[in-house]
Amino acid sequence: MLGRHFLTLACAVAIAIAAPYTVTAATPPDQLVIAVNMSSMRGLDPHELNQFESAEVVANLYERLIVLPADKINEPQPGLAESWTISEDGKTFTFKIRSGVTFHSGNALTAKDVEWSLRRLVKHGLAPSTDLRQWGFSADNVDSLIRATDDQTLVLETPEVWNADLILLSLASFSTSILDSTFLADKAKNDDMGREFLQTADAGSGPYSLRSWRANELLIAEAYADYWQGEPAMRRVILRHLPESSAQRLQIEAGDMDVATRLSSTDLSALEAGGNVQIQKTPGFGFYYLALNQKDEILSNPKVREAFRYLIDYDGLSSTVMKYYGIKQQTIIPGGLAGASTENPYKLDIDKAKQLLTEAGYADGFSKIYFATPVTPEYEVAQSLQANAAKAGIKLDLQGGDHIGKFRERAFEIFSARSGERLPDPHAVLASYATNANNADDAKLTGLLAWRSAWDVPKEIQDMVLAAAHETDKAKRNDLYAKINKVYLESSPALITSFQRTDAKAVRNDVKGYTGHSTWLTRWDTVTKGD
């Protein structure tokens, strides 16, 4: 239970940052205050969450075996694993676990905690478990394949040979965060391995520990004094729920916030012109996408799917809503990765869409319910599509709200959002968008966007994706990805990509070392303040 002193402190912080916008006040020099939209933050269990804002929190509460520096995103570096070796057959990875690391509880971190954490991720079987399950790990085999041989040694064996980089990159994802197994043993309820407890608490070894979180209001994290890399300069990090872009803009202009996220392009432009903040645009490896449920008779028609590609105003959105948030891209491999293409053959063409709808037998159009994430810029993109679809005779009943659960359960007609892949490798996107080994409802492959969309991906595409993941020859792998890009584009996919994701944030000029991360692992312990 929190002490009386901390509760008083938390209340004081909450009151201070809720001050009227008209009062200009700099944030304390040893505190970082971030404005976020918490509406999609549902919990902080790293083996359960799959959400942008939550991931940044987890990146600082926990640590992982491997580190991917923001400026060297494709180069795995030592984290909790100070070194590793790979067997000649490419199937056995042996990690030497760093000594002298302690959890926030004071418990020493050992290979046993790593073993328990990675097994827990797989056994939970939730969406983030895809990061390990895709390599053949399952609840049935994980105990024999991932094991601690002593306090400082972890052995991980893969059932098959994969490109080694894929395994290492997976172990850098926030989903593979290492938890304090001894501490959580006392917090478990009904064999949940601490799942309920971790919704609002932490059991990590990261540079910050969680002190308070009130959903859709306030989150406070405090520097961990015994952090193995040294106590962070920012004594406290505060996340405040400010869903409105205009409110975020006013507060960062006034100096009441250090970092603002989820700002509209209009507000970002104004802040950039003001000179007191810098706009960070961090390239991501995900997309803004439109999902058409293939269990729906109308939407499963290839010509209908193709028609939707002509109802997106790629160029108009690029210069307005998406100016800071995305780069036009209609192919499936993100720019900057092997096999990426600059080909963008589609443009807004209402007449072409009408022609395709007529050929499909829907000359008079149809009506569908359209779920869209109610945040910037996703909702503005959805409104644009709704308006263009109406011109082609399609009535879209646009509904905001938190519909991600319905999407996971295939209980939707049309859904749009943005994805953010955690591995800087083409396979991360392709595994989700272009593989679906079992399209049955009871398969519950919820980590795959293709399964959620009930899309039975053409076998040719799935076979190539699998072959590329196994391929160890770089040139051959690149050739496969280039071919996949072409075939996917020509398949009238149920998952339509329109923009490669870019994450835009406004950061005040006196804040140094706050660096956006392409795989959602932005760190706070690198932050300092000063002119």
Where are these regions (language model features)?
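Detector for C-terminal structural segments
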Residues: E56, R214, L218, L311-A340, ...
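A structural "hinge/loop" feature
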Residues: M38-A55, Q77-L80, N107, D131, ...
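Surface-exposed binding/hinge segments that line
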Residues: Y21, K96, R133-D186
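N-terminal lobe/hinge region of extracytoplasmic solute-binding protein
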Residues: A35-E88, R119, A201-P207
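Aromatic- and charge-enriched surface segment that lines or borders ligand/interaction sites
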Residues: E82-T130, T149, V155-E157, D165, ...
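Ligand-site clamp/hinge motif
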Residues: E196, Y224-A270, K395
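Gly/Pro-rich hinge or "lid" segments in bacterial periplasmic/extracellular proteins
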Residues: A70, S170-P232, R236, I350-D351, ...
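Alpha-helical secondary-structure segments
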Residues: V33, T110-S117, D151-E157, V161, ...
